[in-house]
């Protein structure tokens, strides 16, 4: 690792197992709060609308989640590079503190515009773990299998948190919509002490601090001066501007990154569209049959199919959470199977594309199945549990796709993976902002059946992406500029953001 010669240099890989568990748990608690907060107002829309004198079907209510996701889109572009300059610890502590402050501000909001601003700022701070945790875990976990399990837990939590929030807010908002955010603040308070006491783990920052201590003690060695700046993603003349611009350059020049990001982006947008679609389906009282109506009538037309209360309707998200747990089990099983194949030197296991992408190929067809199931089983003559169970397939597919694609990007771009993940995170968050805004008009014009089917057809088109990558991924990467540099071993170093 090129550590300084002094024996007291803190190597994060040598931390005790208990200390590593603490760091992993701290990251999991932060990402849980980040994900939980993203959909926290979903079950409280009616109460918020009543408080601020808005119509229950006012499209502006969608902004409560969408603006949070705008913060998700912007945050990784800031906090990923920032963590490579000032370290993981100050970024995580600062952003978790910001998340807590602005969650409290949401609970105290005097009006609806103020609430929207505070939601944006919550999302901006909550985006930090999306950009930083992969690197944090890579800093301390050098065993690929252990690191893979940590990141699998990361993905399960990102799927479970948003599903739990509408259930909680649906029941709590019957007291007051403000209590929705007080509960979010309490949940953040549980995780905050864990973050406060994590150590710094980023080696280049630790080297700089250690060198400063040696200099103050009069023990600075010449080779220390020469190596302080030789580590990290930007050590060969990459300025701050270059580091911040790299995600945009990569998304334009790397087909693998672009199409993987589009696939994850649509899946992610569907995940958040469900928070708008489920209330339409499960909290209404009269069937939506797919009539074409004017915009002035469309939102009224969205009223009412099953007529469940917000709290009970929140139970519809539980099958998605169960699906996430099933996907985690499949991830572990395939990881074990692949590791065994590698030890046996099987030819297919040596190919980079087979390391994770078969999981995405398994998950991709499950999305259209879930959407067709949801769309065509949502009828008064069919018990609401039947369309709810479609979420099991969606949860499995969603998590499998994300676990596979995120790790594939890291495998493909190695030392550039931080920038690749930042680009992917920003693109998928942008899609997650835009698509849910179309939910009410789309379901109003097309009805539940055909609106869900339209999304299913798009999912079918995108489902070919992992299969194309499995067959042609290596050929595509060999002709892409950043991938070529990785394959040639340029700028090789211990990758700060490796997520295996």
Where are these regions (language model features)?
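Intracellular terminal tails of multi-pass secondary transporters
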Residues: 1-38, 42, 46, 178-179, ...
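Glycine-rich segments within core transmembrane alpha-helices of 12-TM secondary carriers
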Residues: 146-174, 182, 187-191, 323-328, ...
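C-terminal transmembrane bundle
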Residues: 35, 66-69, 104-110, 119, ...
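Extracytoplasmic
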Residues: 6, 19-58, 74, 129-134, ...
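Cytoplasmic helix-loop-helix junction between adjacent transmembrane helices
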Residues: 118-158
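Conserved MFS/SLC helix-loop-helix module at the cytosolic interface between two early adjacent transmembrane helices
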Residues: 74-113
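Short hydrophobic/alpha-helical segments at membrane-entry points of transmembrane helices
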Residues: 111-119, 131, 180-181, 260, ...
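Helix-breaking motifs and short loop linkers at transmembrane-helix boundaries and internal kinks
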Residues: 37, 52-53, 86-87, 108-114, ...
């Amino acid at each position: 690792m090129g550590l300084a010669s002094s024996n007291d240099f803190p190597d994060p890989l040598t931390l005790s197992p208990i200390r590593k568990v603490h760091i992993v748990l701290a990251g999991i608690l932060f990402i849980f709060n980040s994900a939980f907060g993203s959909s926290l107002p979903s079950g409280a829309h009616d109460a918020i609308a009543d408080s601020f004198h808005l119509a229950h079907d006012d499209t502006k209510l969608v902004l409560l989640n969408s603006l949070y996701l705008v913060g998700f889109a912007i945050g990784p572009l800031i906090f990923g590079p920032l963590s490579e300059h000032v370290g993981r610890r100050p970024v995580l502590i600062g952003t978790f503190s910001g998340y807590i402050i602005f969650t409290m501000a949401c609970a105290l909001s005097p009006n609806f515009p103020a609430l929207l601003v505070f939601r944006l700022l919550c999302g901006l701070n909550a985006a930090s773990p999306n950009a930083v945790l992969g690197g944090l875990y890579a800093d301390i976990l050098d065993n690929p299998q252990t690191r893979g399990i940590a990141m699998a837990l990361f993905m399960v939590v990102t799927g479970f948190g948003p599903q739990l929030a509408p259930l909680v807010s649906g029941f709590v908002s019957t007291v007051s919509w403000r209590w929705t955010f007080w509960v979010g603040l309490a949940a953040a308070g549980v995780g905050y002490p864990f973050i406060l006491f994590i150590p710094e783990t980023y080696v280049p920052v630790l080297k700089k601090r250690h060198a400063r201590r040696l200099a103050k003690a009069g023990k600075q060695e010449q080779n220390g001066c020469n190596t302080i700046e030789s580590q990290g993603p930007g050590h060969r003349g990459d300025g701050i501007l270059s580091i911040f611009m790299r995600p945009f350059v990569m998304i334009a020049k790397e087909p693998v990154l672009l199409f993987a990001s589009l696939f994850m982006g649509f899946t992610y947008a569907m995940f958040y569209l469900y928070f708008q679609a489920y209330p339409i389906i499960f909290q209404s009282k009269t069937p939506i049959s797919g009539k074409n109506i004017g915009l002035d009538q469309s939102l009224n037309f969205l009223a009412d199919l099953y007529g469940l209360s917000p709290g009970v309707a929140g139970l519809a998200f539980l099958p998605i959470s169960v699906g996430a747990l099933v996907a985690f089990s499949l991830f572990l099983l395939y990881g074990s199977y692949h590791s065994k194949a590698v030890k046996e030197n099987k030819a297919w296991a040596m190919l980079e594309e087979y390391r994770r992408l078969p999981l995405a190929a398994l998950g991709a067809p499950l999305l259209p199945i879930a959407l067709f199931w949801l769309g065509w089983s949502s009828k008064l003559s069919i018990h609401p549990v039947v369309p709810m169970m479609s979420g099991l397939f969606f949860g499995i597919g969603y998590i499998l796709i994300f676990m596979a694609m995120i790790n594939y990007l890291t495998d493909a771009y190695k030392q550039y993976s931080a920038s690749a993940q930042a680009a992917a995170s920003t693109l998928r968050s942008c899609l997650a902002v835009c698509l849910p805004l179309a939910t009410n008009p789309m379901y109003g014009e097309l009805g539940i059946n055909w609106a869900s089917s339209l999304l299913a057809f798009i999912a079918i088109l995108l489902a070919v992406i992992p299969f194309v990558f499995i067959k042609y991924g290596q050929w595509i990467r060999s002709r892409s500029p950043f991938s070529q540099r990785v394959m040639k071993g340029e700028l090789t170093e211990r990758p700060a953001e490796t997520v295996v």
